[in-house]
Amino acid sequence: MRYLVDTCVLSELRKKRPNPAVVSWLQRHFDGNDFFISATTIAEILHGIRKLNPEDPRRKPLTEWLEGDIIEKYGDSILPFDMNAAKKWGEIMAEADSAGHPRPPLDAQIVAIALAHNLVIVTRNVSDMNFAGVKVVNPFSK
């Protein structure tokens, strides 16, 4: 299987004591060729960093983590919101709106990228991502 790792999973791994279930799941499933990150996830993380006060002591290490540990190491595995994903996004947003269940645009972008590349989303936020037929797995649950 091929996986699209969501923001909450990447953030969990940065903790001093990451959730043991997440670490165990990743150890069992990680193969560098089968794990991807969406450009939307990069944007979400960068947004969180930039919201911090420039003097906040967390800002510099978070920026270094994002630019070095994520973008530099996994740059080839970062998937853009490209034309195929944009078409999927338009379809799933229209379907969700028509059904009376509008979806947050960024979550829908991640779902669209996963669908465009036939990926399983790895997230804690299953209810936020479990729509439009995308497969979702929660590594936080045992």
Label each residue range with its predicted role:
Residues 1, 111-142:
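Acidic, PIN/NYN-like endoribonuclease modules and their adjacent C-terminal/linker elements
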Residues 1-40, 50-67, 142:
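Short, well-structured N-terminal submotif of metal-dependent ribonuclease cores
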Residues 10, 42-45, 86, 129:
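A generic structural signal for short hydrophobic patches within well-formed alpha-helices
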Residues 47-53, 72-120:
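Active-site neighborhoods of divalent-metal-dependent phosphate/nucleic-acid chemistry enzymes
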